[in-house]
Amino acid sequence: MTDRSETGFQPSTTAAVKRTSFSILGAISVSHLLNDMIQSLILAIYPLLQAEFSLSFAQIGLITLTYQLTASLLQPLIGLYTDKHPQPYSLPIGMGFTLSGILLLAVATTFPVVLLAAALVGTGSSVFHPESSRVARMASGGRHGLAQS
């Protein structure tokens, strides 16, 4: 077994640390936390929505389906697009969609409006996640595991 110092090869662990932008990673982490907490709000208020709109379990399932379809199906498409054409402003745009969905949910008077609100929150998630992943990777300084955690 050869000691790395004998071969003259010294791994540059400090170089990666110096290039890691912890302030950007912190901002992305806080934004991601807020984004995911807001999305979880929909699940948490199912009992309130059921009581307010006299929803059946099927209708509650439709709320989940609407959110999941927009969040899951749009995200890879948006990711493909932003890989080729980075959109740094998509982070606040994604959060704006999520905010719009939550605000619409707060004033919803009919079930279709609740579905639209869920779709807006899902769209916000699908826009936010690809770009936040890209920004975290760029700020990682080569420490991709750290950036994604």
Listing of model-derived features with the role each one plays in the protein:
Residues 68-69:
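Short hydrophobic/small-residue motifs within alpha-helical transmembrane segments
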Residues 117-149:
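Cytoplasmic helix-loop-helix junction between adjacent transmembrane helices
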Residues 24-57, 78:
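Extracytoplasmic
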Residues 56-64:
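Juxtamembrane helix-start elements in MFS-like secondary transporters
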Residues 31, 63-64, 117, 147:
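Hydrophobic positions within alpha-helical transmembrane segments
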Residues 2-31, 35-36:
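Cytosolic juxtamembrane N-terminal segment immediately preceding the first transmembrane helix
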Residues 28, 110-118:
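Short hydrophobic/alpha-helical segments at membrane-entry points of transmembrane helices
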Residues 72-112:
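Conserved MFS/SLC helix-loop-helix module at the cytosolic interface between two early adjacent transmembrane helices
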